[in-house]
Amino acid sequence: MEYGFFAREHADQTLASKIVGAFDPNAATKFAAEDSGHYNCWMKGGDWKTISSERHFADRNLEVVTDRVQTPAHPDPRAWTIVHRKPAVIVAPMTRDGKIILIRQERIPIGQAIWEMPSGQIDDRNSDEDKIQDTALRELREETGYELAPNGELISLGYFFSSPGFTDERGYFFLARPIQSCTEGPDRDEGESILDCRGFSSEEICRMIADNEIRDANTLGICAMLAARGLLSLAPR
């Protein structure tokens, strides 16, 4: 039997104990009350069929399950351990002179502070387009202290899957231009640790990518999308 990312590292019971021990032990009950049955159906379609699903852990941000699934290419059910996560937004803030605002943020799972675009989870998993755009503008204000200028525009750049081998997390890309400073400044969450926030030219971003100074997958992805659409030049100088 073939298993996904987590199951390759842990047997089911070990997985459950390790993950639940790191989070709120009452979270699964709270999650079930708020979102019962949502995650197990929303991504499946066509000839994909979930035969069974076992939940290992859930909180307000994620759920870990092992599903037995039939796929178009594999009619014999296979077991796969999946992390369901809320969708997210990733925003590229662009100033009038074409600079992109990046933040340098501490990330506990990797034990590093890295440069990245502002981003954040969408609270409502069933959000419509307006709610997703509102979340993008909120994250822009909270993390950078910038907002759209009066004549600014928020451009949707599509979406991507962050790591489809083990999670269904979907990220929505946006370009916000031009931006201006908010009078009240950033309004960051208590759990965030943003050490720096400043603008970079396209040449600087290109160099940072080439030198592996930008290592955040969300940021690399949105830079690729901007370059493909001719909105950001990443040609080496």
What are these regions (language model features)?
Residues M1, I19-F23:
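Short hydrophobic transmembrane-like helices used for membrane targeting/insertion
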Residues G4, E9-L15, T29, E34:
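Short, low-complexity, charge-dense intrinsically disordered segments
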Residues E34-W42:
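Short, Lys/Arg-enriched N-terminal segments with co-localized hydrophobic residues
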Residues W42-W48, A113, G120, S156, ...:
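Nudix hydrolase/Nudix homology domain
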Residues K44-D47, V83-K86, I90-R138, E184, ...:
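Conserved Nudix-box catalytic region and its N-terminal flanking loop in Nudix hydrolases
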Residues S52-D97, Q105:
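Acidic, metal-coordinating catalytic segment for phosphate/diphosphate chemistry
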Residues E54, E63, K86-P87, M94-R96, ...:
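Active-site segment of metal-dependent pyrophosphate-handling enzymes
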Residues V64-T66, A92, L102, F173-L175, ...:
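Conserved hydrophobic/aromatic beta-strand scaffold that supports enzyme active sites
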